[in-house]
Amino acid sequence: MEFELEFTPDAWVHLQEFSARDRGLILDAINTQLRYEPDVETRNRKPMKDNLLATWELRVGKFRVFYDIDNDTVKIVYILAIGYKDHNQLFIGGKRFEL
């Protein structure tokens, strides 16, 4: 069954911080990786442990997409945040997070 994708306002702001090329890569990955079986762990998708931001992470090269899933009555993937990783640091919305 196909999942609906829903971006939070913050996620849209995060996405706009990237170049048009990078936005295209990220959006293509979201559409191909999260429309079907977004809750199946793969090489690029994994459940997050002890993370307050989201329950799942999608890796797109250096970019990270953090999302939650509603599997109950309606199938929705909520895109919560989008950032990029540089070595052991994660940047989301211009803020740095240590990993």
Predicted regions: what they are:
Residues 13, 32, 36, 84-87:
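Active-site micro-motifs of SAM-dependent methyltransferase domains
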Residues 32-57:
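A short, surface-exposed loop/turn module that caps and links secondary-structure elements
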Residues 2, 60-63, 68-99:
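Enriched for short, Lys/Arg-rich terminal
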Residues 5, 46, 77:
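A broad, low-specificity signal marking well-ordered, structured residues that form hydrophobic/aromatic
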Residues 15-17, 46, 57-59, 68-70:
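Short histidine-centered beta-strand/loop micro-motifs
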